[in-house]
Amino acid sequence: MMFNLKSRKNRRGFTLVELLVVVLILATLMAVALPLYLSSVADSSKKTCRANMQSIANAAQAWKVKNRAADFTTMTISALTPDLGAVPSCPDGGAYSIATTGSVNDESGASTAIPTGSLGISCNKAGHNGFIPGVMTK
């Protein structure tokens, strides 16, 4: 059986080497793009969590005015539902809590004391930290 060289030249398609080069290029792009994408997703979750804490802080201020309260000691998160509609949930599954004493960890992990008459809002999801309105601006 003889192979006809003329019929081989007329065939169309990709060689194995060409396909391997394409696969190698795609793998390289994925190796660069995937970590950047995952980092962006994690960063957006933290920013959403922070925005939720800001919404809770705004609702707490509204509660304080409506109830003519001197401070936040008698307030609970569930008391904020008239202003929030529903208590926001952390996009990564964490739960929010409000404290009027103690401290809250900021984005660097440093502990910041909650000033008298103020409140601190925390998310129990690791890496999401907390927020004190008027103290923590980032």
Where are these regions (language model features)?
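Extracellular/periplasmic head regions of type IV pilus-like filament subunits
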Residues: 58-61, 65-126, 137-138
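Secretory/exported precursors with cleavable N-terminal leaders
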Residues: 13-14, 19-21
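Aliphatic-rich helix starts adjacent to a transmembrane/signal segment
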Residues: 36-53
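Histidine-centered active-site/metal-ligand motif
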Residues: 49, 126-129
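Conserved catalytic core of two-component sensor histidine kinases
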Residues: 23, 50, 57
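Alpha-helical hydrophobic helix detector
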Residues: 20-36
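Pore domain of cation channels
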Residues: 132-136
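N-terminal leader/signal peptides at the extreme start of proteins
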Residues: 1-14
